[in-house]
């Protein structure tokens, strides 16, 4: 059995509690990065869903006989999959006729009301998605 010297006992004794102090310093920083990663991951989910909603709404309204209300309903349906709140959907032109050559669907989603954990990381960011398609009724 090895014999401990007085110097080695002092070193072992002076390190007591060091792990707890190091954990207390590093854990909040680690969890802050972890929460930020979740929040920015969610921001990407919302952004991609908004892109998809704008595209799907434009596809819905590009066919003859479709209306802006149908495009709004389609975009809302896609955004409801993730529970997006406060989205503003704008269809241009608002009155779609047989002479309409292209349609644009724009969606704005405020991240302040759509944060996963806390809106502190995204602040007043507003995600903007837009899709423009030629209509099938154009000559």
Where are these regions (language model features)?
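Alpha-helical assembly-interface signal, strongest on the long, hydrophobic N-terminal helix that forms
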Residues: 2-76
């Amino acid at each position: 059995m090895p014999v401990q010297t007085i110097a080695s006992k002092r070193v072992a004794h002076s390190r007591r509690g060091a792990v707890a102090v190091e954990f207390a310093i590093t854990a909040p920083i680690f969890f802050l990065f972890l929460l930020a990663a979740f929040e920015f991951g969610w921001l990407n989910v919302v952004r991609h869903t908004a892109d998809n909603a704008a595209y799907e709404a434009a596809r819905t309204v590009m066919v003859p006989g479709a209306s802006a209300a149908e495009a709004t309903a389609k975009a809302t349906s896609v955004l409801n999959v993730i529970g997006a709140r406060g989205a503003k959907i704008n269809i241009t032109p608002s009155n779609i006729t047989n002479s309409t050559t292209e349609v644009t669907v724009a969606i704005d989603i405020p991240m302040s009301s759509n944060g996963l954990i806390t809106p502190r990381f995204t602040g007043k960011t507003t995600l903007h998605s837009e899709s423009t398609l030629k209509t099938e009724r154009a000559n």
